[in-house]
Swiss-Prot record:
It comes from Escherichia coli (strain K12). InterPro entries: FAD-bd_OxRdtase, FAD/NAD-bd_sf, FAD/NAD-binding_dom, NO_rdtase_NorW, Rbx-bd. Keywords: Cytoplasm, FAD, Flavoprotein, NAD, Oxidoreductase. Its cofactor is FAD. SUPFAM superfamilies: FAD/NAD(P)-binding domain. The gene is norW. It catalyses: 2 reduced [nitric oxide reductase rubredoxin domain] + NAD(+) + H(+) = 2 oxidized [nitric oxide reductase rubredoxin domain] + NADH. Transmembrane segments: none annotated. GO terms for biological process: cellular response to nitric oxide; nitric oxide catabolic process. This is Nitric oxide reductase FlRd-NAD(+) reductase. GO terms for molecular function: flavin adenine dinucleotide binding; oxidoreductase activity, acting on iron-sulfur proteins as donors, NAD or NADP as acceptor; rubredoxin-NAD+ reductase activity. Pathway: Nitrogen metabolism; nitric oxide reduction. One of at least two accessory proteins for anaerobic nitric oxide (NO) reductase. Reduces the rubredoxin moiety of NO reductase.
């Protein structure tokens, strides 16, 4: 007996897909299988749990049972999928198997932990489950080391600092947010973090961690050591591709899909943080929302390609929030930066003076939507 559409995963991508399918078809069988509890929570909230004093259970918005009842679903929480038999169209776990007509991989991405001695002492905050496992340690920690100065690392550094903790942030790059924007643009946030008391160790490398009687000793390059109570890895995400690889699907950085979210197997699709769409991995909310809308149509028999417009990325650093869009990481752009007390507007233009990217901060963020309209598609 077929289970209709089977979705592996229960995060934001999977839930958006379910909601979009049910808007168009109330009865088609939908089965979700996931290794977690399947309770709903807002993942971006993890960047602010410490300053807001939230426990892991406080993040739950809807239980798995409520979700199943609302959308007429068959749910299998706490279930590890071990294999996909693509030829037979069967998903397998240790104790069960499910026949499918169409299969969607929404397996997400896992936090990358740098391969240094003592890496097992590093914590990650990529899910409610991960936060639940370490919330007591993080709440009690006075000294926190954050490894990675990208989007999540910068958000966490500000949040822990706002909670009154002594925060050190270490990154190989010469500036924070180095993979997103040039240093002349990120310097405003970098200065604000320093003003707040975050100790920035840039152009620096973590070489190892060791448990001590009074905490964790972090060994850095140039014969430096610091002692902290907790170490958080914020060094990026890696799409979960192991299951897709075992199924014989085409893999690059993520599970490769085309504009229809279809993998190299015509009956298997991928969505969200695990997917690589025409060569791009886009682990942000808006592209996932748009992808879920298109995939729902395609699973129900339409043939709709995904067309992604220029989209905003929000950096949730409350003391100095940023919005950015476009090709902010391009090396050949000229940046025109207008800085005022109430905020910044940075425009990245090409050789033809065409706007290709922008970053806005604080009160100037209201200008983002006007700038967004002028970016090329």
């Amino acid at each position: 007996m077929s289970n209709g559409i089977v979705i592996i995963g229960s995060g934001f991508a999977a839930r958006q897909l379910v909601k979009n399918i049910r808007k168009q078809d109330a009865t088609i069988p939908l089965t979700l299988i996931a290794a977690d509890s399947m309770d709903e929570y807002n993942k971006p909230d993890l960047s602010h749990v410490i300053s807001q004093g939230q426990r892991a259970d406080d993040l739950t918005r809807q239980t798995a049972g409520e979700f199943a009842e609302q959308f007429n679903l068959h749910l299998f929480p706490q279930t590890w999928v071990t294999d996909i038999d693509a030829e037979a169209r069967v998903v397998k776990s240790q104790n069960n198997q499910w026949q499918y007509d169409k299969l969607v991989l929404a397996t997400g991405a896992s936090a990358f932990v740098p391969p240094v001695p003592g890496r097992e002492l590093m914590l990650t905050l990529n899910s409610q489950q991960e936060y639940r496992a370490c919330e007591t340690q993080l709440r009690d920690a006075r000294r926190v080391l954050i490894v990675g100065g990208g989007l999540i690392g910068s958000e966490l550094a500000m949040d822990f600092c706002r909670a009154g903790k002594a925060v050190t942030l270490i990154d190989n790059a010469a500036s924070i947010l180095a993979s997103l924007m040039p240093p002349e643009v990120s310097s405003r946030l970098q200065h604000r973090l320093t003003e707040m008391g975050v100790h920035l160790l840039l152009k620096s490398q973590l070489q190892g961690l060791e448990k001590t009687d009074s905490g964790i000793q972090a060994t850095l390059d140039r014969q430096r050591n610091i002692e902290v109570d907790a170490v958080i890895a914020a060094t990026g995400l890696r799409p979960e591709t192991a299951l897709a690889r075992r199924a014989g699907l085409t893999i690059n950085r993520g599970v490769c899909v085309d504009s229809y979210l279809q993998t190299s197997n015509t009956d298997i699709y991928a969505l969200g943080d695990c997917a690589e769409i025409n060569g791009q991995v886009l682990p942000f909310l808006q592209p996932i929302q748009l992808s879920a809308m298109v995939l729902a149509k395609n699973l129900l028999g339409n043939n709709t390609p995904l067309k992604l417009p220029a989209m905003l990325v929000k950096i949730k650093t409350p003391e100095l929030p940023l919005h950015l869009a476009g090709e902010t990481q391009r090396q050949d752009l000229r940046w025109q930066i207008n800085t005022e007390r109430q905020g910044m507007v940075a425009r990245g233009v090409d050789d033809a003076d065409q706007l290709r990217a922008f970053v806005v901060s604080e009160d100037r963020m209201k200008e983002a939507f006007g700038l967004l309209k002028t970016l090329p598609m």
